[in-house]
Amino acid sequence: MGVYKKLFRYVPNEKYIGYMTIIVSSISAFLVVYGYYYIFLLLKEAVVKGNYENAGYYSTRIVICLTISAVMYLVSGIVSHKLAFRLETNLRKRGIEGLTDASFRFFDLHSSGYIRKTIDDNAAKTHMAVAHMLPDNSQAFLVPIFAFILAFAISLRVGIVIIVLSVVSGLILMGMMGNKDFMKLYQTSLDKLSSETVEYIRGIQVIKIFGSKLRSFKALHDSIMEYSKYAYDYSLSCKTPYVIYQLIFLGLIAIISIPLSFFLTGIKDPKFMAVELIMIFFLSGVIMVSFMKIMWASMNIYNANFAIDSLEELYEKMQEDKLTYGNRDHFDNFNIEFENVSFSYGDKKVLENLSFSLEEKKTYALVGHSGSGKSTIAKLLSGFYKVDGGAIKIGGYPLSEYTKEAIIRNISFVFQDSKLFKKSIYDNVALANENAGRDKVMKALSLAGCDEIIEKFKDRENTIIGSKGVYLSGGEKQRIAIARAILKNSPIVIMDEASAAIDADNEYELQKAFKNLMKDKTVIMIAHRMTSIRNVDEIIVLEKGNVIERGDNDSLVKTGGLYSRLLSLYETANDWRVSNEKLL
């Protein structure tokens, strides 16, 4: 089958296990039916001929066939599970490798819930198709064939009855499988529900704070209602065919057989007719189980096909913006140049043919309305985004010509929401430079104004962040992040809203830390606090992805352009006070 060709591509060295599973399971299927052949011979000898001398011989053969069949089926299942777990592992590894290669734009366009669900859940969906369906499929398709042969070998009547039952049952089962379009809608709604649920759970703290109800989260509520509709419709579509199917195999044969048994004496060979009825019972049961396996196989194979297609689609999206690096390991200087740079998030164009240059060892501030491209420019400078057109150059060469290590080594970031790991304060800073000694780490902490933070705790710099009783404010976390950047000592520093949420108690210490961090560096900063950028070397004003003004604070104020208006709005907002107005 096509789906197994796709799956086996991810386990090239173990696909022989799959073929081994099919062979062993096929032998098991043959032995099952062969066991029923010996049952027929036993019944024929005992019932028709009244000969019990060979009963022990046939009984032994029945036990041997069915036992070996069960053991071989068990072995095929164990082997197929080994292959399935290896496949799941390789699919997840491929996903993780793709994530490490993907540009940051991929993560901006795809939620973490969607990525986790697509990789983890879809990898798990392939398990059933390989671990269970691989051995089951062989039996499901071969057992009916062997059973048909045995039925006609018994008699023409048994063969015709079994064929008619199989055809009718097959038609009924087709009504239970659902069409591909419906199954695709069902799977898509399930994917959407899983993704929205993950995002909902990750935001549960905010949800509880505001006492929000599920209905207020329209995306999650709609996905739940949509999935419930498809699940209910699918259940209803299966109800009638499944009841009829059960009735035919479990009820109809019994209903017909009871009155028929009263007329056995009027039949030419009633004893053989009785044996035929018993074999119809046996063979119809075997075929019923096989057909149910076929139904589940078709569903699980469809799920596996959908899963592998979803994974490969995600892998392709990861590769679309795969970052490429060069061999240049040294920056001649740290002048920055945007040369006709274009960039978009999906279909949304953010920058188009943007050009400007920044001199090394100067401090620049990016200012503009929300959506003007400030954060995008900062992100592009990181080297972890692939531009749609143009080039970003540092030291006269495009970023794509430098090694990944060179970019990481020479560019530092301080963001508004700095991430600290559940390690000691010391380790959180030291990871910026693994070769730095203890003295350098402690000096970086001191320059970032972290001395008073360390003194609060009994274990000082060895205090584990996130452990019981250890709480850090936003400003304290930010200072530790700045210490990390100071220790890294990169020539280029990018600060995106680094002081946006800092309280008054921390602002003074933070500004001192910023001063130590920015010394003799090329600094690009984004800040909503206009007071924090008045003393920078140059302010660059952006609107709709274009530079419309640039200069120092005084010259831009005199110009009376967008910067002047933004500064005026900031001062007005800063002077706003709650008076004697009644707040509702």
Model regions and ranges:
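Helix-to-loop junction immediately C-terminal to a conserved catalytic motif
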Residues: 382
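C-terminal portion of ABC ATPase nucleotide-binding domains
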Residues: 512, 529, 534-584
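Cytosolic ends of transmembrane helices, especially the final helix of ABC transmembrane type-1 domains
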Residues: 193, 212, 236-239, 287-316, ...
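A hydrophobic transmembrane-helix motif
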Residues: 27-41, 68-71, 135-177, 236-284
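Transmembrane-helix motif of ABC transporter permease domains
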Residues: 16-35, 47-88, 274-282, 289
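Membrane-integrated ABC transporters
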Residues: 1-31, 54-58, 80, 125, ...
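ABC ATPase nucleotide-binding domain helical subdomain, centered on the C-loop/LSGGQ "ABC signature"
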Residues: 93, 393, 401, 426-467, ...
